[in-house]
A protein has these predicted regions:
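Extended redox/cofactor-interaction regions of prokaryotic respiratory oxidoreductases
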Residues: 1-80, 90-96, 172-272
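Electropositive phosphate-/nucleotide-binding environments in soluble metabolic enzymes
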Residues: 18-21, 118-122, 126
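Catalytic, metal-anchored helix/loop core of enzyme active sites in primary metabolism
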Residues: 83
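Catalytic alpha/beta core of large soluble enzyme barrels
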Residues: 86-87, 316
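Glycine/threonine-rich phosphate-binding loop and adjacent beta-strand/alpha-helix elements that clamp
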Residues: 92-114, 125, 129
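Short clusters of hydrophobic/aromatic residues that line enzyme substrate/ligand-binding pockets
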Residues: 97-98, 105, 112, 161, ...
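Long, contiguous, secondary-structure-rich segments that constitute the structural scaffold
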Residues: 121-167, 244, 249-263, 267-349
Length: 349
């Protein structure tokens, strides 16, 4: 019998699309509830529980596992909970095949040997594959053969790339295809543009999906008390000095901001009696964090923006883990509900 994929019972339309990935946004619940079946072990590659809404709930799920392994460059908080931590080699410690514009291929050779027991992620996968006596065309013959496997369609060999660090142009170049739909159709059950989605219609009775595009304002369907939480919380945008959680490990980059910045529009600052640099508290139905107000003209009135990844004030602590898009299953990182108020005292760095 075919085993039900993780997320399939909650977001079935995801699996009817041309997608080969499980939907893991609710994996913490699946682990803790043992539904649709018990999940006893997990192997993560760079797993960071703080990237999920209500990260403490995910942390609880990791602790409930019988066996948990994390492969990472850093001894992160998620790694500290693991039964086994496998150190990953950095990009300076591994050979990697790259392709560039114009059909060019390159070999990025390691600058140094892996430090300590660090290994390439793929080599770790190959080791697990062999230990479990599994077979995979791309991986089972080792890392060198894996890179050759990647290159094979191009007609370029690994030996050529080693001899030509400037790169080698692929001999088999697949030109851009135009109007592929005329021969292959679209990725829909009918192969046509569907004004009424057959996939969504399939789950109309079981999940309430509508085959026709239907606008539903999230502010009205959430059931949220808008008087208590009148502002919209936005997170996940970019900052030039930060890249997700990883750059918070670099003290001089993290130190550019004394604490978590809470960006608000001048109109909201005036409305709530907040000045630039004030200590504020942002609260939602599931949590609250403190930060420093940054009155920001380029933001929208009614929107509060908090950057993610800062363990000292994590934006995802504010987002309900059940606030998910009903079709795709992705969390509403851009549109949850909050309030803001001035806090007494000073923010500790």
């Amino acid at each position: 019998d075919t085993i039900e994929a993780i997320g399939e019972k909650d977001f079935p339309a995801w699996f009817d699309l041309p997608c080969e990935e499980a939907q893991c946004t609710r994996i913490a619940d699946y682990i803790l509830d043992e539904d649709p079946y018990p999940l006893k072990a997990l192997i993560g590659f760079g797993l960071n529980h703080r990237m999920w809404p209500e990260p403490e709930h995910f942390q609880k799920a990791l602790k409930a596992l019988d066996f948990y392994v994390n492969v990472d460059l850093f001894f992160s908080d998620s790694s500290k909970m693991a039964d086994l931590v496998l150190p990953a080699a950095s990009s300076f410690e591994r050979d990697v095949v790259l392709n560039g514009r114009g059909g060019m291929f390159f070999l990025s050779e390691k600058a140094i040997e892996p430090v300590g027991e660090a290994k390439n992620d793929i080599e770790i996968m190959i080791g697990m594959l062999r230990a479990m006596q599994l077979h995979d065309e791309a991986l089972e013959h080792g890392y060198e053969k894996y890179m050759e496997y990647i290159l094979e369609p191009s007609g370029v060999t690994l030996e050529e790339l080693r001899a030509h660090p400037e790169g080698v142009k692929g001999r088999v170049i697949i030109p851009p295809a135009f109007k592929r739909y005329e021969k292959e159709g679209f990725h829909t059950p009918s192969g046509k543009v569907e004004f009424v989605s057959q996939i969504l219609e399939r789950y109309k009775d079981s999940h309430g999906y509508s085959g026709l595009p239907e606008y539903r304002d999230f502010r009205e369907v959430s059931g949220m008390d808008r008087e208590a939480y009148p502002l919209i919380l936005n997170t996940g945008s970019r900052k030039p000095q930060l890249f997700h959680a990883r750059t918070y490990r670099v003290p001089w980059l993290a130190g550019l901001e004394k604490a978590t910045l809470v960006e608000i529009h001048p109109e909201d600052a005036k409305k709530y009696g907040i000045a630039d640099g004030d200590m504020v508290r942002v609260s939602s139905p599931v949590g609250s964090i403190c930060g420093i107000a940054a009155v920001y003209l380029n933001s929208q009135p009614g929107i509060v923006h908090v950057y993610h990844g800062n363990a000292k004030g994590e934006a995802n602590d504010l987002i309900d883990r059940n606030y998910l898009d009903p079709i795709s299953g992705f969390p509403g990182y851009k549109s949850y509900f909050c309030k803001i108020e001035k806090e007494k005292g000073e923010v500790k760095a």
